[in-house]
């Protein structure tokens, strides 16, 4: 929708905001029922005069959207963190679990796949197919969330992943296996992006740190994959020296059991999302589409679910338009189909242009995307190929059982990372410094890891490295993408920014897969990963905007 507003300087905007808020408070005191609610607490909304954010975002958002979004933020603060948001925190976590089911699942089943299927030049080519799918999925689901809303991705991606994980378990050749993983990648590429945006747009600003804690579900998913690999792959796989000539399907069912279990769990999560947990479209997306009434309904739905008074009315949002010189007309409400058609006609790169509206925002966008690309290469070079590296590192006195036991221990230790990160990103160091410090420390430990000489030393060092790298992963990969990135971009363009970042991450994963295809499971990928993590830390120090202390708009 092409709506023009008068150009207003910062001082005039502050005066307008103050006048609007005072009128809103008076209206609410006079008209809203006051049963069991102290008069001074009814609809108390304070002006948010965040000059730093206003300067940072510039013309990337309209004054009307910014004021309405700040009003919604204050309403969410009044509602507080309640039953609805904690349920959403759990249901959104399902997406993180399934994301790990896919990313770690393909890594876990590649060794037995190579033993059973004939004609495989490099088993990691299946990872190449998977990452191609993820690149497509991240772009599609991220950008579409700005065009048609957050809910379609929220409800669809888990179903796609679950169905095709089960289907992949039934394949009997490498080409079909890789093709199905490409489809799985289209779902895995976008689900976590939208899950993070949805949680961010429903929680009060005081609880935005939960976006970092949300990634603890990802580590839980890694632990599930590790346990399934230990149970199924260690006990229902061909011997480690088997070849396609000696490894039959009947003797190698472990990887199939693993994928069927992962797919079944994903479908169960899908059922809960669609049929058990009821969620409206996010109010920030609705505001960006000019659908003020639906945004009011969404905010008040959260209030009712939390047992709180409804804090928002349509007249409050309309007052902002009137004070800015825009009078809403009575045009008929566009359907979802019409909104999609109009958005596609008007898109023409406008969402991307808005991400470079100011000098600082341009620098921020470029660095965020660069960091994501580098992490996309660094992380899978070590962690996605860890089971195969462990299996080949100490072949003389190791076994599949020992390999996956170690993998489970490392995964369990990694769960600590997100919880610690959620606390530390809220300290005086903020997001940027914690990202930079933890990334550099991770790189140092990865450099040292390749020097261990015994299996027990390898396990101990892997646990420490796993803790730090998962910790850095929350403060770099996950805190940047799934906490810092959505926090730092405005909702009208949040999906485009996050989706593009995720696409670059997945492109980095594709590069990592190609590197592994050429180098094999040697120490070379670990050295490369270590150097890249150090580089990420340096770039994090150059980010121009800190989201700690600022409520997302």
Curated annotation (Swiss-Prot):
The gene is hxnZ. The lineage of its organism: Eukaryota, Fungi, Dikarya, Ascomycota, Pezizomycotina. It comes from Emericella nidulans (strain FGSC A4 / ATCC 38163 / CBS 112.46 / NRRL 194 / M139). GO terms for cellular component: membrane; plasma membrane. Coiled coil: none annotated. The chain crosses the membrane at residues 89-109, 128-148, 152-172, 174-194, 213-233, 257-277, 366-386, 409-429, 433-453, 459-481, 496-516, 525-545. Belongs to the major facilitator superfamily. It is found in: Cell membrane. Major facilitator-type transporter, part of the hnx cluster involved in the purine degradation. The nicotinate hydroxylase hnxS accepts nicotinate as a substrate and catalyzes the first step of nicotinate catabolism. The major facilitator-type transporters hxnP and hxnZ are probably involved in the uptake of nicotinate-derived metabolites, and the oxidoreductases hxnT and hxnY in the further metabolism of 6-OH nicotinic acid. It is a multi-pass membrane protein. One of its GO terms (molecular function) is transmembrane transporter activity. Keywords: Cell membrane, Glycoprotein, Membrane, Transmembrane, Transmembrane helix, Transport. This is Major facilitator-type transporter hxnZ. Induction: Expression is induced by nicotinate and 6-OH nicotinate, subject to nitrogen metabolite repression mediated by the GATA factor areA, and strictly regulated by the cluster-specific transcription regulator hnxR. Glycans are attached at residue 235. Its main location: membrane. InterPro entries: MFS (IPR011701), MFS_dom (IPR020846), MFS_trans_sf (IPR036259).
